A protein has these predicted regions:
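Beta-sheet-rich non-transmembrane sensory/scaffold domains
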Residues: 1-195
Length: 195
């Protein structure tokens, strides 16, 4: 699913913003809700996942599992059991820095293992100061901040090779920067938010 709006200003939408930036499973026969997994709580970085998930079958602990993989703009790869929504690899909730003016979430689900892209900035670009080493989920206020990645995995779809068991992903290694809107008007039920 997409992110909540306004996407760079979380001050008006406290909480995790349930079902945004999520993988949502519905029963194909009835349309009934099955499960969901939220990839980013209270997204202020535009870290939704615009490309489709990849479905695959894999043996784990001697049992064949029906897997689902989603590579996100956050630069993380979420691997879930597509029947239950449970992670096939660990995805602990990790404490992250806070920005009270953005009502940021206290934790984010971060998959264990190697990342697809760097999640910190080695050195500040000229004229900029780094906050929190520019790490992923660095919150920003009205003064702004740099963070990495910017659109770690964007629109290009992923591909899985069942012969090799490899997932192929087109990823970006770019620095992002944002500042909270100074005067945000409350959204109305008739507005469309694009991000």
């Amino acid at each position: 699913t997409g992110n909540a709006g306004p996407d760079l200003n979380g001050s008006q939408r406290a909480g995790d913003n349930l079902f945004t930036v999520s993988i949502l499973a519905l029963d194909t026969d009835t349309g009934e809700y099955r499960w969901h997994f939220q990839q980013v709580h209270h997204d202020i970085w535009d870290y939704d996942s615009p490309s489709p998930v990849v479905l695959f079958d894999v043996e784990k602990d001697g049992v064949m599992r029906k897997g689902l993989a989603e590579a996100s703009k956050s630069g993380y790869l979420y691997i879930l059991d597509r029947i239950t929504g449970e992670p096939l690899i660990g995805i602990p909730e990790v404490p992250v820095p806070q920005e009270p003016g953005q009502a940021t979430a206290a934790t984010q689900p971060i998959p264990v293992g190697d990342s697809m892209v760097p999640h910190f900035i080695d050195a500040a670009p000229e004229g900029f100061t780094l906050v929190n080493d520019g790490k992923t989920y660095t919150p920003f206020g009205k003064e702004g901040a740099l963070y990495k990645p910017l659109a770690g995995v964007n629109w290009p779809p992923k591909s899985y090779d069942p012969e090799t068991g490899l997932l192929y992903v087109c990823a970006n290694d770019r620095i992002g920067g944002a500042a909270q809107e100074r005067e945000a008007s409350p959204p109305t039920h008739t507005e469309t938010w694009l991000g």
